[in-house]
Amino acid sequence: MEYDDKLVRFRQGHLNPFDKQGGAERHPADSEAQPPKDSSTISPHSIPEYHCPDRVMDLGVSEDHFSRPVGLFLASDIQQLRQAIEECKQEILELPENSDRQKDAVVRLIHLRLKLQELNDPLEDEPNLRILLEHRFYKEKSKSVKHVCDKCSTFIWGLIQTWYTCTGCSYSCHSKCLNLITKPCVRSKVSHQAEYELSICPEAGLDSQDYRCAECRTPISLRAVPSEARQCDYTGQYYCISCHWNDLAVIPARAIHNWDFEPRKVSRCSMRYLALMLGRPVLKLREINPLLFNYVEELVEIRKLRQDILLMKPYFITCKEAMEARLLLQLQDRQHFVENDDMYSLQDLLDISSGRLGCTLTEIHTTFAKHIKLDCERCQAKGFVCELCKEGDILFPFDSHTSVCQDCAAVFHRDCYYDNSTSCPRCMRLSLRKQTQNPEAEP
């Protein structure tokens, strides 16, 4: 009995605060006055009401910095997605043609259809694929620890953590960070925009960003309180340390205006965008900076080689042997070289600066000229004889000592053509033939 009394006193002095029953006896009146707080007894009028937008497709697509970005929708079931798709179609038809709002609506429609396809497909068919904000995330099987999550900026431990990589922009992140991503895939920007910022570090100041990161809107300042502000040399904007890792990249504006290829610090988003744009021929140097050809001799040489290759192209298209040998495929990495002579990619400028492109293009030019002038009889038969001096050597429009008539494309020796620039024998012959065939056309 003495032991039981001690045990009771101990329990009364050491009550468990998490024990809803309590060690002490409750008065019956208290239990009646305070009914148990069960969820089933709560009045329906006390439940907060959540007002949804009128249209399903408007969920999460408002245009302020703190809303969900385009492509992230609250609609999660198939019925809501189908309704949102129909509403988006109707909006596209109602908006002005080729307007920015109509383009945004088309992008939203693409997002909705991709999400609907992801829900319709069985999980067993593509268990390793996740589609989010135009990212196509595939589950990685690498166990290496050399990767860093682009979202949380921590190491990815491949042995114990599941992680994904976007096939479009190489964005890597943990599986737990996928739903936290707010930045769309930059490949969509490359597809729609496909142009560079051509102003050198167009800084506007932290006040224009409301002292927040240009990407994630985290508060930043130059004094590193609460977070350090890092400037991107490409966009001129400021970013937090999670969005700016001090990556280095060549800035297109500095290369075009100053012929400067020194890598500068850029944000993660700018680095991925510049990497995707590196091989795209979007720079028309003669319009952006025509004086560059007066100061960079390598550019003049490359332009002459490209012009010669364009003159050789008709020979290869009509030559069976050249088509079988696939000579033009030697330029498959730079397809724009066989289409025009004035468009350049940033990779072209880098290779011109280092001297690699000049050597490569000279070798290809030599191979092409050898086929036309020596190896192929059909191509040799398409050569020209100078009608001004009547010498027997065969001329081609890409020869360095020749000139081409702008009207009839006849080829002459350069000296002969300039000495008789007032008259072209072939043009005169064609004009006389035309008058003979159409005598009624004469005045």
UniProtKB/Swiss-Prot annotation:
It comes from the Eukaryota. GO terms for biological process: lysosome localization; positive regulation of bone resorption; positive regulation of ruffle assembly. This is Differentially expressed in FDCP 8 homolog A. Residues 1-49 are annotated as: Disordered. Positively regulates lysosome peripheral distribution and ruffled border formation in osteoclasts. Involved in bone resorption. SMART domains: C1, DUF4206. Keywords: Metal-binding, Repeat, Zinc, Zinc-finger. The lineage of its organism: Eukaryota, Metazoa, Chordata, Craniata, Vertebrata. A zinc finger (Phorbol-ester/DAG-type) spans 134-185, 364-424. The keyword Ubl conjugation does not apply. Belongs to the DEF8 family. InterPro entries: C1-like_sf (IPR046349), DEF8 (IPR051366), DEF8_C1 (IPR047983), Multihaem_cyt_sf (IPR036280), PE/DAG-bd (IPR002219), RH_dom (IPR025258). GO terms for molecular function: zinc ion binding. PANTHER family: DIFFERENTIALLY EXPRESSED IN FDCP 8 HOMOLOG, PLECKSTRIN HOMOLOGY DOMAIN CONTAINING PROTEIN. Pfam families: C1_1, RH_dom.
